Structures are given as C-alpha cells and as structure tokens.
C-alpha cells in the first residue's frame, strides 16, 4: 500500500533533485566525487562555505544517501539550523508547499558529529565511526568536514583521512578557509592547500566580488561546463544556475 503522504514526499524529493543547480557540472544524477575521493570548497570567512556543503548534503539526502556532517566550528544545534533554513529556502524557491514531514523524512539520512579543533584526530574519528557502524547506528556514504585546520603540519593527517575514506568507501568534502590578501601558488592553489592540494580530486572556489558570489572550479570539473553560471545567492546562500 502506497500512502498519499509517502507519495507526496517522494514527488517533492524528485522535484528538488531535478532542480539541483549542481547538475550543470555535467554528471547527471551522480555525485561529484567518487568513493575515496576528496573535494574542497574554498572561500574567505562569511562567503558561504558551510551553506554550500549543507546543500551538497541535502541533495545526497534527497537521494537517500547517508551523510556524516563533522563540524569543528559549531555545535549540533547550529548545524541543524543550517539544514532547516536551507531546506526551507530550497522549497520556497521551487514554490513547493505543504512540506510537512519532508525534512523529517530526510533527517535519518544525516548524522552530525562535533569535535573541538584541537581534539580532532584521525584515530579518534575512526573510533567513533567504528562505534556507529558496528552498532548498526549509521553507515555514511558522504562525509563533510567543516572547519578542518589546514596548515603546514596537516598533510600527514589528510593522508590518513584519505586512507580511512578509501577503507570506508566514502567521499569527503572539506571547507577551506582562505584570505583575500593571500596570493595563490604557482599552481593556482591558495596557500592553505600548498602542501596538500594534490590530495584533492575536486576543488571549487567561492569568489565574492561585490554582491556577487561565483562558483569557480579549480580542479576536477571542466571550467567551461560551469563558466560564470553557478552562483551563491548572497541573500539566501542558495546555489543558483544562471546558464
């Protein structure tokens, strides 16, 4: 028996998936990253890195994929608010009404984990993940790490994380905090990724110019596929396609 409520929720999900602007990356319904791969979203503070990651997560959750959101900056309650706000804004933009129960239907596909920056280690993360999976509580397919402290000593930690991602069969998105005054390296990378940029398969930069925020691919996606098309709306932080 298919209940009307369940059918409506499925319709809303499919509608939001089809409206996802990131489909213009040319990968159809597939994720941007493959299992074991790293992606990075680069921007200065306040430009929209967390909002971008949450929208990646919501799109995966709409496809019933399990998302582990690791925050090194914010408590669980604040991360949860990001999801609620951006989901409502996505629905409003799509003129979808009567959304009772839709977000609640998605939440079992998300698990939020928080660490203090100084307390975040790969062995500690692996221990907590092992507890989740061994007890059959949560088996992530996508991992977000918001607030990772990129620096000179962190290549080894990133290499250990990549090995862990490969063993678990997950792909990982990071936020990377950049500074407007910093000059890129000869390879076009920000200094924060100077020693570890080669570990990343996809790198996207949020480029704020005035009131406009463009999404520029630096690696892993053909730039002509999204040339000046994808934006972050500075009012809502929603990704939009102007192609």
Stretch-by-stretch model annotation:
Residues 1-10:
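Short, Lys/Arg-enriched N-terminal segments with co-localized hydrophobic residues
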Residues 18-32:
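Pre-Walker A adenine-sensing motif
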Residues 34-39, 65:
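Pre-Walker A (Motif I) flank of P-loop NTPase domains
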Residues 45:
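The conserved Walker
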Residues 48:
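Conserved glycine(s) of the Walker
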Residues 51-117:
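Conserved P-loop
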Residues 110-170:
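Phosphate-binding/switch loop-helix module in NTP-utilizing enzymes
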Residues 177-243:
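Phosphate-binding/switch region of NTP-binding enzymes
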């Amino acid at each position: 028996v298919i209940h009307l409520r369940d059918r409506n929720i499925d319709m809303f999900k499919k509608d939001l998936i089809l409206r996802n602007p990131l489909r213009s990356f040319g990968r159809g319904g597939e994720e941007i990253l493959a299992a074991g791969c790293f992606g990075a979203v680069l921007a200065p503070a306040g430009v929209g890195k967390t909002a971008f990651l949450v929208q990646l997560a919501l799109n995966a959750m709409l496809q019933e994929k399990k998302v582990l959101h690791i925050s090194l900056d914010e408590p669980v309650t604040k991360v949860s608010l990001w999801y609620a706000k951006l989901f409502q804004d996505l629905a409003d933009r799509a003129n979808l009404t009567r959304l009772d129960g839709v977000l609640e239907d998605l939440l079992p596909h998300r698990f939020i984990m928080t660490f203090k920056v100084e307390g975040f280690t790969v062995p500690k993360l692996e221990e907590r993940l092992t507890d989740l999976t061994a007890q059959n509580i949560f088996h992530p397919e996508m991992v977000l790490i918001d607030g990772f402290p990129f620096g000179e000593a962190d290549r080894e930690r990133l290499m250990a994380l990549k090995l862990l991602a490969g063993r678990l069969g997950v792909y990982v998105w990071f936020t990377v905090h950049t500074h407007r005054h910093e000059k890129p390296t000869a390879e076009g990378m920000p200094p924060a990724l100077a020693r570890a940029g080669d570990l990343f398969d996809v790198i996207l930069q949020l480029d704020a110019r005035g009131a406009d925020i463009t999404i520029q691919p630096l690696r892993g996606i053909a730039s002509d596929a999204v040339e000046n098309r994808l934006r972050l709306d500075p009012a809502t932080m929603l990704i939009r396609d102007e192609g």
